[in-house]
């Protein structure tokens, strides 16, 4: 078929001849009419315009008037100017951006994966805002020296975020201190602790500012303020003086102060619930802070509604003020909630790590970041960027109603310690984050829960935060010690209760419980119940209740027949210890693997179990997981392990695309992946990955894996290309001959890859056209990338072969 086009005025005429000679005869006639030389393609008067040489010749000229200068029809010149203007105008109408129509355009779905811009990895947050705690003043007050009107006793404030819609707590506790210095002096100085206060720890012993973050902000997120005081007695009797008015308030101030002063000297270790308040935060789901909202009144704490579930119900009831009838304690809260400024300096992470810029000698009080408990869903989590290794313990409930051993146990406190062995001479580890409020080290060896007066089955809401060691073993455990705390000061002072382990006489031990931190090699992170024993003998971790009155291990007497009396909950926020059983199993196995056949088979089993790993955990640990899998490729000796590894990689890449998290894959390739260079191994990632992919392109391979690979082949090709470049850098081959940069086996693998890849595309052209199109684009980018590294003659051969496999109908 032979043809050409003629443009006359505003129309284009296409002429097609059956033979070359016929087309040339037509051109001869047209050239004779227009005065154009057929052999040179130029007008006989050397004016502009002419023919474009090629298979399809096109008659071209600058404009209509130019083409008529040598015409044998000069009368046409009369309207030439007007015709040119009309043509120029019409050419601008309805023009298409033809380059955007190219099938290689990054705007077309499926092609953007290779050219997507990737941000430098950084720590990601939700909506962040600053909370500054300035003051808390109760109407019941007293003057101290020159200071006018301060609280009569110290108060301890805890702030946390609660999501009423999701019915859960979404942040850790922030303990802030708003006590005046003269009030804080009512508390005794702590005893010396080995490895005690650091040089700059006093800077954040009295924190007042915190940075909160909310990934999914909405109007039902509340900031909840809990107020505690030093243990004195029942909540009702302790709040009564604060709710008086007039002369009764003034008369009661002195008496209340004297009682508080005595309590601070003897019971300062223990706190009791006192009151609470709430504040809504957001106007809408976009995270706009509601500046017009204020704190609710301070409500007396109900002793029967201490749990987080009960608190969430209270918060919901507070929103409907006409139905909420809780007693109000007159007080004023001064706490500002503002957007986080961009120039905030001297802040610290939730693990007390300084954030640059940070001046440790500055007198500016640091701002503490509060850990958000991000939902474990793919769209909310990100790969870990900042070290964290914290363990949260929540004692929930203790049931001493039916135990007969400690009949006087009423005001029960739970002391929590973290220990690395169960010998009597061992000391607890100093790794529990200390609560603020007095000059203490950042970490302590033990902490206590709040005490509920005269209650044998208390409910707790305390959060104990522990900084975990990097390496854990089976002897690491939590030790819970239960104390009955006497609130009767006269009896306590006269030594009515025995002093144990140097504790003040106000305490009496009433039981022990312990919880090993690891179960089947993994950290326990769930809600569970454990029994309580009367004592903790040497080697108590080996003791457990066997049922039917039998005891296993050291002789221990269990309360209430060994029933699980203590209910607790735990949570892990760690970049070191995973929470998915399958990911954790792989990590532990690879750490212990020795390359033996038995070890290789175990590796294969661990890889197969990764198919059911949680997507959110995969995203959090993605760089580490992918590094481990690519490492397995170059150290394994079994083809089965190679096949399982590639299958898992394809599965992960496909899953992350399905949940719209391909961004973490882009980030990994560009910023995290580094070619693994191991001494004693001549294998490379690019060669082993290419060989592994061949197994899933051959006839009879798993069609699901094959289809997933074709759709997301860009990631594997990008890893191969980057590994090829890394190989040249590490081996100093950047300046070497292209033909000798890579082994002959790798060239053969590339050839086989192409030979197997094309039939997969052709097979899907009709029924899975989208998959075929995406695979075609991925291969095009890969071949383009090969020009940078390998013999370009070989690359052109690849292109030639690729094109030869397609018929004209296939390219439509």
Language model regions located:
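Short, conserved beta-strand segments of beta-strand-rich sandwich/propeller modules, principally
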Residues: 3, 222-224, 477-479
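Buried hydrophobic core positions in alpha-solenoid tandem helical repeats
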Residues: 629-630, 761, 783, 799-802, ...
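Eukaryotic regulatory linkers and domain-edge "caps" enriched in S/T/P and acidic residues that sit
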Residues: 18-23, 27-465, 469-472, 485-642, ...
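Canonical phosphoinositide-binding patch of PH/PH-like domains
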Residues: 11-18
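Short, intrinsically disordered, charge-balanced linker/junction segments flanking boundaries
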Residues: 1, 44-45, 799-811
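Hydrophobic residues within the alpha-helices of tandem HEAT/HEAT-like
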Residues: 482-486, 648-654, 716-724, 779-783, ...
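Glycine-centered tight beta-turn/hairpin loop motif at sheet-sheet or coil-to-beta transitions
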Residues: 8-10, 330
């Amino acid at each position: 078929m032979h043809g050409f086009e003629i443009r006359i005025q505003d129309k284009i005429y296409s002429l097609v001849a059956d033979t070359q000679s016929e087309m040339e005869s037509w051109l001869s006639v047209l050239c004779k009419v227009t005065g154009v030389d057929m052999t040179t393609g130029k007008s006989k008067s050397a004016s502009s315009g002419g023919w474009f040489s090629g298979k399809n010749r096109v008659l071209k000229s600058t404009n209509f008037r130019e083409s008529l200068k040598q015409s044998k029809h000069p009368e046409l010149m009369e309207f030439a100017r007007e015709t040119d203007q009309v043509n120029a105008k019409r050419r601008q109408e309805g023009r298409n951006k033809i380059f955007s129509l190219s099938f290689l355009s990054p705007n077309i779905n499926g092609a953007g994966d290779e050219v997507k811009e990737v941000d430098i990895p950084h720590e990601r947050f939700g909506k962040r805002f600053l909370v500054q705690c300035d003051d808390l003043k109760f109407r019941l007050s007293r003057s101290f020296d020159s200071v006018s009107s301060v609280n009569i006793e110290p108060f301890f404030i805890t702030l946390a975020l609660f999501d009423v819609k999701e019915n859960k707590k979404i942040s850790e506790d922030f303990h802030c201190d708003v006590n005046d210095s003269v009030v804080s002096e009512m508390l005794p100085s702590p005893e010396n602790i080995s490895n005690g206060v650091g040089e700059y720890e006093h800077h954040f012993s009295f924190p007042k500012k915190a940075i909160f973050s909310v990934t999914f902000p909405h109007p039902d997120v509340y900031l909840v303020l809990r107020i505690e005081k030093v243990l004195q007695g029942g909540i009702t009797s302790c709040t009564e003086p604060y709710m008086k008015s007039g002369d009764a308030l003034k008369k009661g101030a002195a008496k209340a102060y004297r009682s508080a002063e005595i309590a601070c000297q003897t019971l300062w270790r223990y706190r009791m619930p006192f009151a609470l308040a709430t504040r809504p935060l957001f106007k809408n789901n976009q995270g706009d802070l509601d500046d017009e909202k204020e704190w609710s009144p301070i409500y007396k704490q109900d002793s029967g509604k201490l749990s987080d579930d009960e608190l969430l119900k209270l918060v919901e009831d507070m929103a409907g003020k006409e139905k909420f009838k809780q007693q109000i304690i007159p007080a004023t809260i001064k706490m500002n909630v503002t957007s986080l400024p961009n120039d905030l300096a001297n802040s610290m992470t939730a693990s007390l790590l300084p954030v640059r810029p940070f001046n440790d000698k500055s007198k500016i009080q640091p701002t503490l970041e509060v850990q958000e408990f991000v939902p474990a869903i793919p769209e909310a989590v990100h790969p870990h960027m900042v070290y964290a290794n914290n363990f949260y313990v929540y004692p929930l409930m203790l049931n001493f109603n039916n135990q007969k051993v400690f009949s006087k146990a009423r005001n029960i406190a739970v002391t929590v310690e973290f220990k690395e062995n169960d010998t009597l001479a061992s000391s607890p580890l100093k790794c529990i984050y200390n609560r603020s409020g007095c000059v203490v080290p950042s970490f302590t060896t033990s902490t206590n829960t709040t005490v509920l007066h005269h209650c044998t089955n208390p409910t707790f809401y305390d959060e104990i935060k522990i900084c975990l060691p990097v390496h854990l073993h089976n002897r690491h455990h939590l030790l819970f010690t239960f104390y009955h705390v006497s609130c009767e000061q006269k009896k306590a002072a006269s030594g009515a209760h025995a002093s144990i382990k140097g504790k003040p006489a106000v305490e009496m031990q009433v039981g022990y419980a312990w919880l090993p931190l690891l179960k089947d090699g993994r950290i326990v992170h769930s809600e569970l119940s454990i029994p309580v024993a009367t004592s903790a003998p040497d080697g108590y971790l080996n003791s457990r209740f066997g049922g039917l009155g039998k005891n296993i291990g050291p002789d221990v007497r269990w309360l209430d027949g060994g029933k699980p009396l203590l209910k607790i909950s735990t949570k892990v926020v760690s970049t070191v210890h995973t929470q998915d059983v399958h990911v954790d199993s792989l990590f532990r196995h690879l750490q212990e693997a020795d390359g033996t056949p038995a070890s290789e088979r175990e590796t294969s089993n661990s890889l197969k179990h990764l198919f059911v790993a949680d997507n959110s955990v995969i995203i959090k640990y993605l760089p580490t997981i992918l590094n481990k899998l690519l490492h397995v490729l170059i150290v394994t000796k079994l083809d089965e392990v190679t096949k399982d590894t590639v299958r898992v990689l394809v599965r992960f890449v496909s899953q992350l695309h399905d949940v719209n998290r391909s961004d973490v894959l882009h980030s990994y390739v560009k910023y995290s992946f580094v070619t693994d260079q191991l001494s004693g191994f001549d294998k490379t990632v690019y060669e082993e990955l290419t060989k592994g992919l061949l197994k899933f392109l051959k006839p009879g391979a798993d069609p699901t894996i094959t289809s997933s690979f074709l759709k997301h082949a860009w990631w594997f090709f990008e890893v191969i290309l980057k590994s090829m470049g890394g190989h040249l850098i590490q081996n100093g081959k950047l300046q070497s001959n292209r033909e000798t940069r890579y082994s002959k086996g790798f060239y053969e693998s590339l050839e086989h890859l192409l030979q197997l890849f094309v039939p997969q595309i052709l097979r899907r052209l009709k029924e899975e056209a989208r998959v075929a199109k995406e695979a075609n684009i991925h291969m095009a980018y890969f071949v383009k990338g090969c020009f940078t590294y390998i013999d370009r003659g070989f690359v052109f051969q690849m292109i030639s072969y690729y094109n030869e496999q397609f018929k004209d109908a296939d390219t439509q």
